[in-house]
């Protein structure tokens, strides 16, 4: 058990919906800033934003106080990823590693592009379908260097340490051996998932090859350094909310009562979710280039 819990506000699949995180004392925290990057030696925390097979594009709201999880919005409409044949929604549990930040002011030497201004993304490949807002502990196995509309957008490949097969996975080659086709599907998914929305295919550094565990950890630790500069005001976040309750060296630290006041001002939890539009289930067929 991680000791963290989540609390929903308003109804899922609405513009007002939020998922706030709490610590073991039941106090509200930021999943971006207050959950430690490391859970143990070489074990990272992961904030689950999108459960496997689902379509609603949920993400940590980097500009909102306490950074709750909310559904992404484009042109006033809630975003859902398309089902690009043969896939259904996201093909892994998708989320982020806390206390990391891909700095948009830093030009990555591997990709030649600046960061995407978000925590680093994680694709968790275990057998369990996780819950939105769940905090899990993961082993990092490798990383993919995606370039999304000119921005560096690293994709970490990891597995839940609680997975029954976790002991068999220690590096990216284990994924190739034990889950044949999964990494190829991952590249294909990321390359084409925006095409149904009229966007071009995404590009990749390293000819779309996955780098190994050690390379991945180096990248994650560099994004942790960028995060620390952000939260200690050594870097201008330009609109990012760095409000936190635990980072003692941060000028943005607040007390638990101030955090509670943020949540108390929002709509209460809702018993039922709104209906997902039926066209979200549509299957798109697109010729691979």
From Swiss-Prot:
Tissue specificity remark: Highest levels are found in retinal rod outer segments.
Catalytic activity, per the record? diphosphate + H2O = 2 phosphate + H(+)
Enzyme class label: hydrolase
Q: Which residues carry this modification: N-acetylserine?
A: 2
Keywords noted in UniProt: Acetylation, Cytoplasm, Hydrolase, Magnesium, Metal-binding, Phosphoprotein
Among SUPFAM superfamilies, the record links this protein to: Inorganic pyrophosphatase (SSF50324)
Instruction: Enumerate the residues binding Mg(2+) 2.
Output: 121
Positions annotated to bind Mg(2+) 1 = 116, 121, 153
Modification after translation: The N-terminus is blocked.
Q: Sorted alphabetically, which InterPro entries does this protein's record hold?
A: Pyrophosphatase (IPR008162), Pyrophosphatase_sf (IPR036649)
**Under the GO molecular function aspect, what terms does this record hold?**
inorganic diphosphate phosphatase activity; magnesium ion binding
User: Do you know which Pfam families this protein is assigned to?
Assistant: Pyrophosphatase
Q: Which residues carry this modification: N6-acetyllysine?
A: 57
Provide the protein's localization: Cytoplasm
Could you provide one GO biological process annotation from this protein's UniProt record?
phosphate-containing compound metabolic process
What GO CC terms are in its UniProt record? Answer: cytoplasm
> Which cofactors does it use?
Mg(2+)
Q: Does the keyword Metal-binding apply?
A: yes
Does Transferase show up as a keyword for this record?
no
Residues with Phosphoserine modification: 250
The UniProt similarity line reads: Belongs to the PPase family.
Q: What assembly does the database describe for this protein?
A: Homodimer.
Protein name, UniProt field: Inorganic pyrophosphatase
User: What is the species listed in this Swiss-Prot or TrEMBL entry?
Assistant: Bos taurus
Classification from the root reads:
Eukaryota, Metazoa, Chordata, Craniata, Vertebrata
Gene responsible for this protein: PPA1
